[in-house]
């Protein structure tokens, strides 16, 4: 069994943009030609996340309003397998342009075939005691997408491109929904990530990669009624 452990990431800057799938080749070309010499540190993979929120949807409201300090809670796992798989609880905080995470790695297993929440999420290790981060929290949405990874030659700049986004609204208290989905195929998300100490690199990336940073939340997008917006 893999050991369970908790860690807090360093603060970093994350900037995002949404763009049309038809522009993918333009971004890939700009990344390839960048003087930062990007390479692919990992193969593309599917990311799956269960997003939690309280009864009043405070996390959703904070994100929409752009409140200074925002918190999102999610259990994340990777791949398309339908059997039980190790998962990580992420408590992500964002304040202004800075974000950081509290990670509880290997604390949970997720069973994508489960029909109930009792069977979907299994706690593997109680060494930390009850996890207060999920008290009064309910599963609100499951989001899946494919992610490409790029990293500068010196490891200081990371870029991800997310596509084929789909979300599954969780509005029945005890039953999971992994059948009825909402497709978000009319856009992709590009995200640039740098450590807070390397903030000066953000402007260099913006000069080379053709995007305009904006606030964007996959969780919000999954809950807000879908509109026919095409980023051509």
Language-model-detected regions and their locations in the chain:
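Phosphate-end processing signature that detects enzymes handling 5′-triphosphorylated RNA
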Residues: 1-232
């Amino acid at each position: 069994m893999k050991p369970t452990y908790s860690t807090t990431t360093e603060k970093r800057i994350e900037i995002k943009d949404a763009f049309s799938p038809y522009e993918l080749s333009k971004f890939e070309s700009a990344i390839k030609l960048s003087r930062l010499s990007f390479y692919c540190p990992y193969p593309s993979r599917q990311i799956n996340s269960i997003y939690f929120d309280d009864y009043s949807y405070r996390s959703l409201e904070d994100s929409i309003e752009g409140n200074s300090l925002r918190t999102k809670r999610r259990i994340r796992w990777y791949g398309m397998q339908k059997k039980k798989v190790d998962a990580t609880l992420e408590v992500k905080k964002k304040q202004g342009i800075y974000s950081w995470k509290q990670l509880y790695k290997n604390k949970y297993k997720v069973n994508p075939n489960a029909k109930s929440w009792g069977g979907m999420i299994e706690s593997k290790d109680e060494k930390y005691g009850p996890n207060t981060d999920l008290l009064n929290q309910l599963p609100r949405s499951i989001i899946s997408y494919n992610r490409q990874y790029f990293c500068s030659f010196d490891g200081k700049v990371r870029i991800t491109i997310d596509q084929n986004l789909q979300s599954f609204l969780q509005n029945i208290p005890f039953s999971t929904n992994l059948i009825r989905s909402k497709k978000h195929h009319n856009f992709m998300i590009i995200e640039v990530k740098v450590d807070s100490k390397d903030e000066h690199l953000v402007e260099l990336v913006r000069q080379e990669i053709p995007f305009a940073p904006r606030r964007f939340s996959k969780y919000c997008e999954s809950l807000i009624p879908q509109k026919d917006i095409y980023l051509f």
